[in-house]
């Protein structure tokens, strides 16, 4: 497959934040941001040796994307960071048919907040981050650390919760291939867009494939909903920062609700069963004392009111903003 079938990703200088917001962030268009992290202390300090010597004893979660694609973060196998980096350095220059572990997203900042001093969490190209406004019980980690090597990669996927994702290279180089959400019909989760046959089939279905290289000190902006497949060109260290702005948060909220509502529905169904049994029992027995002194009826009325208010706010938003803007 010749390069003419692949669309080269655009790039922009990190200092031109206004142009980035206008042309890329607001239009949800991917771009390589040149020099985003070039002045970060991490670029000067972080290395394989730094992490082996400073955090080598820490057990970190590793993933196996081919065999355990949907594995939750808390269920991932943990190995000492020094052991992982030694394995990465050993396997960086050889081909291997055996699936190797990948440190594809270590949520490091809670355990080692000092590492945040080496990066910039308040990216100048982005407005206020709504992830910081979420309650702790449903927080979405705003940053994670990725250490990779030549024989491991993340397969084709989209990021959850409609986040803006910014992948900043600290050490090494990565290549990325992307497909727009408008061409979702041509791809599926877990594919390898760097496989010539798969890429050929995607292009044959009428989809566009975008490709770019992210070098040390540069960042890769991945808009919400975009399919992306990232490979390591050698040993790499990168930071992924997640961001949700005002425009995207209603979509994030919708996905979060999608996780919470099934749990709430199960609880409500159990409550409904209990009420049915209670109604039957009331024919022979009076209501339990706890129902009388625990404000049961008042709480139920308040719950119904909250549900109605929430539904009305959603209806008002659809009619006054979304539907009007869709028809214009």
Annotate each PLM feature.
Residues 1-219, 227-328:
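N-terminal accessory scaffold of Fe(II)-dependent oxygenases
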